[in-house]
Amino acid sequence: SQFLDPDGTFPNHIPNPDNKEAMESIKNQVLAVGADYGVIFDTDVDRAAVVTGDGELLNRNNLIAVLSVIAISEHPGTTIVTNSPTTEHLKRFITELGGHQYRYISGYRNVINKAIELNKAGTDCQLAIETSGHAAFKENYFLDDGAYVVAKILMLLPRLLERGETLDYLIKQLVQPKEVVEVRFKIETEDFKTYGNEVIKEFPQWIPQDWVVNPENEEGVRIDFKGEYGDGWLLLRMSLHEPLLVLQIENDLVG
């Protein structure tokens, strides 16, 4: 265990499974002591992430992939609701498992509410999860419960062992982007929402002709691209809580 002395100033790192420094800290400790796995929570344990014995980080898209394996194996054909900035590789991963991904607007409560709504409308949805680490299973009353998430992963391990597989093997089936970039543009005007939404509306007018607006998107504008600029996507959206435009880009080509 690390950092057992309570200190509300969090002097070691931000207690956040979506934070690079926090994940690097637990990864280094797992590798240093030769642990089988490492587990990290946020302060109120509604978010979690895992590090494998080989140092593979199971957060963000990787965590969604692992939990999707669990949900789809237990409920074939189920739908996984995620927030919008997830990779196209993840969508293909879920589809190849026999499941469906429903990308929705950011905010863990938005994702959970959409899953509840889909179930009421007759679409089986067993998992709602954000890249931030908030994950909620239908069987657990759609509570975002980090401890429950870790328990589900631990229960997956014997099934993997029977097949001669590990979490490391499992996550290697998910293609990883070569480059990931996030840029936050501050909107310095009083009516920032109107301004930001106008930028998003006009943005597709300025993209190259061979880039494509992805219709399966409910937040901001998502663009898919291939060719000389690589193979990837970008998402331009408003921040949930701040006067910011958030641009997220993933590419299978570095640079």
Residue ranges and their predicted role:
Residues S1-Q2, E56-H75, G146-L154:
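Gly/Ser/Thr-rich active-site loops/lids in small-molecule metabolic enzymes
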Residues S1-V51:
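N-terminal small/polar loop signature for handling phosphorylated ligands or for N-terminal nucleophile
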Residues F3-D7, N62-A65, I105-N110:
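Short, acidic/turn-prone active-site loops that include or flank metal/cofactor-
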Residues G8-I14, V69-A71, V111-I116:
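Short, charged, surface-exposed secondary-structure boundary motifs
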Residues I14, D54, E139-F142:
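Short, solvent-exposed loop/turn segments at secondary-structure boundaries
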Residues A22, I26-V30, S68, V111-A115:
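Generic hydrophobic alpha-helical segments
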Residues Y37, H75-G255:
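Phosphate-binding and adjacent anionic-ligand microenvironments
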Residues D46-V66, L90-K91:
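Short Gly/Thr/Asp-enriched flexible loops that form oxyanion-binding sites at enzyme active sites
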